[in-house]
Amino acid sequence: MNTFTWNDMNSTAREYILMSKDVRDMQYRKQWPAPGDKTLIELVASENKALKFYLDLTENKRSSSLILGLSADRKSTMQTRVSDRPLIRLDYSDNLEVLRHRNPDGSLIVGTHVHFDLDGYGAKWACGIPGQNILKPKSYDFASLFWSFQETCNITDKLKVELSLGV
């Protein structure tokens, strides 16, 4: 596959992602999880309130070492799912070598990448940000990727997630 597009996605997953979603508890200020933690935000779609959507935010533990300064490799994940079915997931790292994913065809993706729900594979297939045209960040920094993810998943822009500097 050259460039992933909306048409490559499972049609039901695409329909779910494109549904307009709001925060179920109407609490729009959330905190990004601390290293080693996960935040689960329940979402509701106005088109079908029976569906249970979630935005999962995960901040992996960081391995820090003191070598003329502090070096902490950040690994974060944001995922939108319906019940227990992942629809789209973004795996982010500020160090290309820390984040690797092997696709079902054996190809290796290194660095920040996005998983899509594809027919026959679920969300096991990933590509780098430049290898798709679904998630369209203004830049590849963490904040821009998060806002683009939120927009792509059609999650209300009222939701504000505060990031900590976390070391």
Regions inferred by a protein language model and the residue ranges of each:
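Charge-rich, low-complexity N-terminal segments
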Residues: 1-63
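Broad hydrophobic/π-residue packing in well-ordered secondary structure
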Residues: 2, 9, 70-76, 81, ...
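Generic secondary-structure transition motif, activating predominantly at the C-termini of alpha-helices
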Residues: 17, 21-27, 94, 150-157
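Intrinsically disordered, low-complexity regions enriched in Ser/Pro/Gly/Gln/His and often acidic
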Residues: 23-25, 118, 140
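A short, compositionally biased
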Residues: 34-38, 68-75, 110-112
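Aromatic- and glycine-enriched beta-alpha-beta binding-site module
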Residues: 46-100
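An exposed acidic His-Trp-rich patch
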Residues: 77-134
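Acidic, proline/glycine-rich low-complexity IDRs
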Residues: 129-167
